[in-house]
């Protein structure tokens, strides 16, 4: 996943808020995913903002360390491959 990508939740996926972040359930293939609270701003952005912009904002506010951003992008790419999120073009 690139910092310039914008992502949105797949139409067949529902989020349920939890203490740790959220549960994402895919109605398409009945898979359940645990979404860490640090991923919620990216997954729940509806494609309105670039993932790099969201990451920069979280780093500036102290909610995320800069060193964690590459790992987060890798996790987002994994969620894209599994159909949880899609890159908005």
Walk through the language-model features, giving the residues of each.
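Long, charge-rich, low-complexity alpha-helical segments
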Residues: 28-89
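Long, low-complexity, charged/polar intrinsically disordered regions in eukaryotic proteins
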Residues: 1-30
């Amino acid at each position: 996943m690139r910092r310039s990508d914008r992502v949105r939740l797949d139409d067949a996926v529902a989020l349920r808020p939890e203490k740790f972040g959220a549960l994402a359930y895919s109605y398409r293939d009945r898979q359940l995913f645990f979404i860490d609270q640090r991923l919620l701003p990216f997954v729940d952005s509806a494609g309105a903002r670039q993932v790099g912009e969201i990451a920069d904002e979280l780093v500036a506010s102290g909610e995320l360390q800069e060193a964690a951003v590459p790992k987060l992008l890798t996790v987002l790419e994994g969620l894209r491959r599994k159909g949880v999120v899609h890159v908005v073009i």
